[in-house]
Amino acid sequence: MKAGIHPEYREVLFHDVSNDFKFITRSTINTREKIEFEGTEYPLVKIEVSSESHPFYTGKHKIVDTAGRVDKFRKKFGTVGSKTQMAE
C-alpha cells in the first residue's frame, strides 16, 4: 500500500440522539467533536437513527418529522430549478 494516501481507520463513538444510545465502532469518518467515554476520548458522530431506535429493529412505530425537513428545504432553496422557472 502507498503511504500517506489512505484515511485514518480508528475507533469512533456514535451517539443516537433520539434515545441517548452510544456505541463504538471503527470508521474513517471525519469529525470535529470529541467525547470522553469510559475513560477514553473518541471522535463523536451524532446520528438520528440507529438499530436501537429504528422501527424495523424495535418493532415500535415512530413518527418521523419529514414535513419539517421539506419545509426547511423549501425555505432554504425556494423554487430554484422548478418547472415553471425553467419554462421562462
UniProtKB/Swiss-Prot annotation:
This protein's GO CC annotations: ribonucleoprotein complex; ribosome
Any GO BP: translation
UniProt keywords, alphabetically: Ribonucleoprotein, Ribosomal protein
Pfam families noted in UniProt: Ribosomal_L31
GO molecular function, one term: structural constituent of ribosome
Assembly and interaction partners: Part of the 50S ribosomal subunit.
NCBIfam families reported for this sequence: L31, PRK01678.1
Similarity annotation: Belongs to the bacterial ribosomal protein bL31 family. Type B subfamily.
Name under which the protein is recorded: Large ribosomal subunit protein bL31B
